[in-house]
């Protein structure tokens, strides 16, 4: 695998049985990762990673504490994309800042059965196409691909500024009993809260 040599960094899997328990990436390709079949049990930080990931068939049981399937910008020749055309994919995410299916570009789902459990089931920076198949997010069937990038909650607003100042004191009493025309001080302005997006 060499990131500066486009013909390299491809992974193609046509079938087989795979069981992995690793600390980093289970299946990693710099350019294209294509899987046409097989049985996969993967426990990893990122179970499947590449620039363009295409899954046509297979059975996947993925457990991850970072990204279950991650399309990242590893090659300049492809737009980061997760394309799923078939298969049965079960993804279980650990708690924390994790994503079931994460794409720095697009997600295309044309078929298959996908079940994702976790705080963030899908996260993508580009567009999502749901043309066929079945998707479950935390046990609930959905009719469109959610996006954690668009659904994050904003943080709490900032505290207001100081309260207004006290009014000014009146002028000194003049001889003859009348009080001078000292003007009250203007009240101070309250500061505006700051909304922080989460």
Protein language model regions, located:
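A composition-driven surface/loop motif
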Residues: 1-198
């Amino acid at each position: 695998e060499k990131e500066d040599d486009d013909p390299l960094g491809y992974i193609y899997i046509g079938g087989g049985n795979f069981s992995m328990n690793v600390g980093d990436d289970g299946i990693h390709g710099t350019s294209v990762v294509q899987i046409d079949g097989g049985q996969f049990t993967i426990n990893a930080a990122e179970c499947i990673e590449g620039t363009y990931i295409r899954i046509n068939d297979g059975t996947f049981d993925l457990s991850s504490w970072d990204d279950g399937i991650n399309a990242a910008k590893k090659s300049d020749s492809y737009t980061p994309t997760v394309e799923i055309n078939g298969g049965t994919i079960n993804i279980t995410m650990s708690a924390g800042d994790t994503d079931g299916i994460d794409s720095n570009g697009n997600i295309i789902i044309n078929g298959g059965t996908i079940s994702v459990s976790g705080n963030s089931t899908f996260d993508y920076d580009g567009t999502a196409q749901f043309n066929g198949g079945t998707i479950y997010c935390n046990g609930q069937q959905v009719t469109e691909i959610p996006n954690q990038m668009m659904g994050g909650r904003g943080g709490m607003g900032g505290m207001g500024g100081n309260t207004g100042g006290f009014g000014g004191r009146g002028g000194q009493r003049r001889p003859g009993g009348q009080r001078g025309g000292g003007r009250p001080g203007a009240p101070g302005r309250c500061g505006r809260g700051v909304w922080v997006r989460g």
